């Protein structure tokens, strides 16, 4: 076991790896009386085309298979479910699927060993029968239908369909109803066998526990299991072209106040910074111009033009996106104001220093939240493939010249606006 020392913030992450390739990341917090475990698989909803070594053709599975597999994986060979086992322990469990990965989680106060062993066991022991699959289809189809009636869901995927031409983020994580109905046991087994391998998974444990004991439990558990050789599947992604699918889209939804999402898409090659650093700078720039303490937000609220406004960014593959989210009764007035602001983003030296101090304070304080830090570790592993041990240094070295360089290179030529309006 080795330690990943997080420089400047007096924290460390313990790291080990099992003989079968399963990595273990642990952060101990003796100030709490609980623990949070997540077992993640680097397989998400966009991974619908893949091939393994020696294969000439890509395998294509239905959209939503990652999410479907997450659902049925709670079934146990004895006819029970993982929920029943953890309920008896007094533990809380859940799972979720994103575009990029699938995560199974356990939150508990006691019975550390039993919780850890069974998390590993139920996730790594598939039990798929035609009857269980057919039963689950009805449940997931209802989930799909409910999601499509959710205003936030409509706005998010409406924008994805407007902004992206080829990227699979256009598609629902759940898949459409037709995808769910068409999913087969063979597909689920194929995905499980290909991706649910220790070398393609990682375990993160945060909270109050003994890391040496945890590693011993995991290694003993994994030593009892036999896994076939990892086939290192290659995922197929279509290169996302510039330009947008639709510049303007209006969608009716169950809302009282219209919601707006203005999004911009640009190539990452515009920026001469790595993904992690670019993400930090964009976050600071957007918060300064559209965040809770921004002048624009205060002005729009004071004039009662908006109920709320905020911004976020995303970086994947070689694409950078920026989203401005607005809730307003006056979209025709507010949209031009926001677009004009995007042309005139500002960040001065004092703003940057203040936000650096805020980020460093958050970096330190966030380690008290075992769920947050667990999620952050997982996100770093999925997004960057490693854990940065120098975030304090990165924040400390941010400078106004680099920030303004990034502002100057933001390309607004590929933009979509999606407006969510009340049903007529």
Spans of features found by a protein language model:
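His/Glu-rich zincin catalytic helix
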Residues: 1-81, 189-299, 415-424
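M16 family metallopeptidases and their MPP-like homologs
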Residues: 27, 32-48, 80-122, 156-178, ...
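Acidic/histidine-enriched alpha-helical segments
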Residues: 56, 126-145, 210, 230-241, ...
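Short, flexible, solvent-exposed loop/turn segments with mixed acidic/basic and small polar residues
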Residues: 92-96, 189-196, 311-316, 404-409
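Conserved short hydrophobic interaction patches
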Residues: 122-125, 217-225, 341-345
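Short, low-order "capping/linker" segments at domain edges
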Residues: 145-149, 153, 243-257, 361-377, ...
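Active-site glycine-rich loop that binds ribose-phosphate moieties when present
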Residues: 180-191
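Internal helix-turn-beta structural module
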Residues: 393-411
């Amino acid at each position: 076991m080795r330690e990943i020392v997080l420089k400047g913030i007096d924290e460390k992450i313990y790291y080990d790896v099992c003989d079968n390739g399963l990595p273990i990341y642990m952060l101990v917090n003796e100030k709490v009386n609980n623990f949070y475990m997540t077992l993640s698989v680097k397989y998400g909803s966009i991974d619908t085309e893949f091939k393994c070594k020696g294969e000439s053709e890509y395998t294509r599975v239905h959209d939503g298979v990652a999410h479907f597999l997450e659902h049925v994986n709670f079934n146990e060979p004895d006819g029970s479910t993982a929920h029943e086992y953890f309920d008896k322990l007094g533990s809380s469990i859940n799972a979720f699927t994103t575009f990029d990965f699938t995560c199974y989680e356990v939150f508990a106060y006691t019975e550390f060993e039993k919780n850890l062993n069974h998390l590993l066991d139920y996730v790594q022991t598939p039990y798929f029968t035609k009857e269980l699959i057919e039963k689950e289809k009805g449940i997931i189809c209802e989930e799909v239908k409910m999601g499509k009636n959710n205003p936030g869901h409509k706005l998010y995927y409406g924008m994805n369909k407007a902004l992206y031409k080829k990227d699979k983020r256009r598609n629902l994580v759940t898949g459409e109803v037709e995808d769910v109905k068409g999913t087969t046991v063979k597909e689920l087994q194929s995905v499980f066998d290909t991706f649910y391998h220790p070398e393609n998974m990682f375990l993160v444990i945060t909270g109050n526990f003994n890391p040496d004991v945890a590693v011993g439990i995991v290694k003993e558990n994994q030593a009892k299991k036999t896994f076939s050789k990892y086939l290192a599947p290659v995922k197929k992604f279509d290169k996302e072209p510039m330009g947008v699918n639709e510049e303007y889209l209006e969608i009716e939804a169950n809302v009282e106040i219209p919601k707006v999402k203005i999004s911009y898409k640009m190539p990452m090659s515009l920026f001469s910074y790595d993904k992690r650093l670019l993400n930090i700078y964009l976050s600071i720039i957007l918060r300064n111009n559209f965040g809770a303490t921004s002048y624009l937000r205060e002005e729009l609220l004071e004039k009662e033009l908006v109920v709320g406004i905020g911004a976020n960014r995303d970086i994947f593959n070689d694409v950078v996106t920026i989203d401005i989210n607005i809730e307003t009764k006056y979209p025709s007035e507010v949209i031009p104001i926001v677009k004009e602001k995007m042309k005139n983003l500002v960040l001065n030296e004092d703003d940057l220093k203040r936000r650096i101090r805020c980020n460093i304070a958050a970096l330190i304080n966030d380690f008290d939240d075992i769920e947050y830090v667990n999620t952050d570790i997982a996100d770093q592993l999925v997004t960057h493939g490693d854990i940065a041990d120098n975030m304090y240094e990165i924040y400390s070295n941010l400078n106004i010249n680099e920030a303004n360089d990034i502002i100057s290179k933001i390309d607004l030529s590929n933009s979509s606006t999606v407006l969510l309006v009340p049903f007529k």
